[in-house]
């Protein structure tokens, strides 16, 4: 697996962090519609900034989305409205959240 591909995948540690962050009463739920996940790590795999745009596989770029909301985010004309909602959600979760820090850069992201 190439380093860039690895950097954009959510590893188990990231999936657990996303799942815990997006939980209600200890159970992961879709952050958009509120549906409960069928299993603890089943839905912790949506990128705020897509892999195709270089989005990193880090919790700050991850969202728990049900399959319906994930498809709507990836493939519908609702993307911009949903993206605004997710941006506010992630900014609320992480004090120093920045979209620029979520994009893979060859050679590292600490510049």
Question: Where is each model-derived feature located?
Answer:
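Short, charged surface segments at domain edges that flank catalytic/cofactor-binding sites
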Residues: 1-29, 56
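Histidine-centered divalent metal-coordination motifs
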Residues: 47, 69-70
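Phenylalanine-focused residue identity feature
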Residues: 10, 27, 48, 85-86
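Detector for the c-type heme attachment site
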Residues: 35-36, 70-72
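Histidine-centered nuclease catalytic patch
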Residues: 29-64, 81
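A broad structural signal for alpha-helix termini and local helix breaks/kinks
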Residues: 22-25, 37, 94
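Polybasic, low-complexity binding patches
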Residues: 2, 52-64, 71-111
């Amino acid at each position: 697996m190439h380093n860039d591909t690895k950097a954009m995948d959510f590893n188990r540690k990231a999936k657990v962090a996303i799942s815990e962050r997006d939980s209600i009463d200890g159970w992961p739920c879709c952050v958009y519609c509120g549906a409960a996940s069928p299993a603890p790590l089943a839905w912790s795999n949506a990128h705020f900034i897509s892999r195709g745009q270089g989005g990193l596989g880090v919790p700050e770029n991850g969202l728990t989305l049900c399959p319906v909301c994930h498809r709507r985010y990836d493939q519908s004309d609702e993307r911009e409205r949903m993206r605004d909602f997710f941006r506010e959600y992630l900014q609320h979760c992480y004090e120093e959240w920045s979209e620029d820090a979520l994009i893979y850069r060859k050679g590292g992201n600490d510049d």
